[in-house]
Amino acid sequence: MAKPKLDHIGIAVRSLDAAKIYESLGLTIEHTETVASQGVRTAFLSVGDSNLELLEPTGPDSTIAKFIEKRGEGIHHICLRVDDIESHLARLKAEGYRLINESPVPGAHGCRVAFLHPAAGNGVLIELSEKIE
């Protein structure tokens, strides 16, 4: 199993349009996408070999809307790119880590993703992502 790589850092925002600070810092939005199953509109900004993912809720009941309501805008998760998401999930579950998703679900860029509970990541929500070839 290859070592995971940092894919992106997810940042919850009320509005993608209001998050202009990143463009002022010289970053460019490379890709936007709505992931209806997760109730979120995303914008990816390239930062070297990684990305920032801005997450805007598409409705008041989305996970991101609830996160912003409870904690305000800010860092939501870190995402690690893996080559075999099922193997990683099976190993983590066998080791007793708490998973939000025991099986991958569709994510942005056509990737398969799964989240580990923040209790498993020292208070940090960790997303695993596998690119579909």
Enumerate the language-model features and the residues they cover:
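A short local loop/turn or secondary-structure capping micro-motif enriched for an aromatic residue
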Residues: 61-64, 133
